[in-house]
């Protein structure tokens, strides 16, 4: 390893790439997320290692993990990266307020008909941003988006508020050939022992609630492939590798011949919430809040 070039400013883009590699545990998957080739990503991490003067990742490990020095580096570098991202997002949010633009985050199917109606009623220019399940609240807190339509239960971060829009039943997405696929409704015990999708990046409490874990029967929930979005989850379901419990509106949002959505009759309903920053008094956000409140009151 070359001697660290201490006078060189730390490249936060390279730090961000390192965090993706660690999260994925694999250069190829991380490269796919970053829209670069695996060799190019490996060179980026080498460049960062040369800059700090130590090896940060153990490339011989499967999955790829941080070295001891990498653990120390990431612990200190992650807050700096998050601070820089928040600073840039704050400037972007200020510019959007001035231009009366609104950036709204969503996970596929989360907004439902009420959310779509609220968006359609706005006078502000709207940009929609698709979020991973793990980003539903954090994207609002960091000002990556101005608001988001989310699916609780979610951890409430400081400065972020949730407003209930509506509630609806939950359904289970099953591969078309599943023994329960032709039913109009089932009880949760009928899928006890069936493998459920997981999501490593999402809050564990959120994953468990949506999987109805623990089950009333006491049967342990079996978790399978980890996914980040509903699109990924449904691909896993279609391939027969797991099932996913989700909101009834997902069945309206996705029409697929290889998947059946069946209502679960004996579990708690789910909600749709609007997530915004508590102190955000921009005209576009206020307009969105009012639209959501009015539509919710009409139901």
Regions found by a protein language model. Name each.
Residues 155-163, 168, 231-280:
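Beta-alpha-beta core module
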């Amino acid at each position: 390893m070359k001697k660290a070039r201490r006078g060189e400013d730390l490249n936060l883009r390279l730090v961000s790439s390192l965090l993706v590699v660690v999260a994925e545990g694999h250069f190829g998957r991380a490269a796919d997320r970053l829209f670069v080739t695996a060799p190019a990503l490996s060179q980026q991490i080498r460049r960062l290692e040369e800059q700090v003067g130590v090896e940060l990742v153990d490339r011989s490990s499967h999955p790829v993990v941080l070295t001891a020095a990498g653990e120390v580096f990431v612990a200190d570098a992650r807050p700096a990266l998050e601070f820089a991202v928040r600073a840039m997002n704050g400037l972007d949010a200020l510019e959007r307020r001035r231009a009366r633009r609104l950036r709204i985050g969503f996970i596929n199917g989360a907004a439902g008909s009420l959310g779509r109606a609220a968006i359609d009623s706005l006078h502000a220019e709207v940009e929609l941003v698709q979020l991973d399940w793990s980003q539903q609240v954090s994207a609002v807190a960091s000002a990556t988006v101005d608001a988001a339509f989310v699916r609780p239960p979610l951890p409430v971060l400081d400065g972020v508020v949730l407003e209930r829009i509506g509630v609806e039943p939950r359904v289970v997405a099953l591969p078309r050939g599943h023994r329960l696929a032709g039913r109009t409704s089932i009880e949760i015990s009928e899928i006890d022992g069936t493998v459920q999708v997981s999501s490593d990046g999402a809050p564990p409490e959120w994953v468990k609630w949506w999987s109805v874990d623990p089950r009333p029967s006491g049967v342990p929930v079996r978790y399978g492939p980890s996914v980040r979005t509903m699109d990924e989850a449904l691909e896993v379901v279609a391939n027969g590798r797991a099932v996913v419990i989700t909101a009834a509106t997902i069945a309206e949002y996705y029409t697929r011949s290889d998947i059946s959505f069946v209502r679960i009759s004996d579990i708690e309903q789910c909600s749709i919430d609007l997530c915004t920053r508590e102190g955000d008094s921009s005209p576009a956000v206020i307009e969105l809040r009012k639209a959501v409140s009015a539509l919710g009151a009409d139901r």
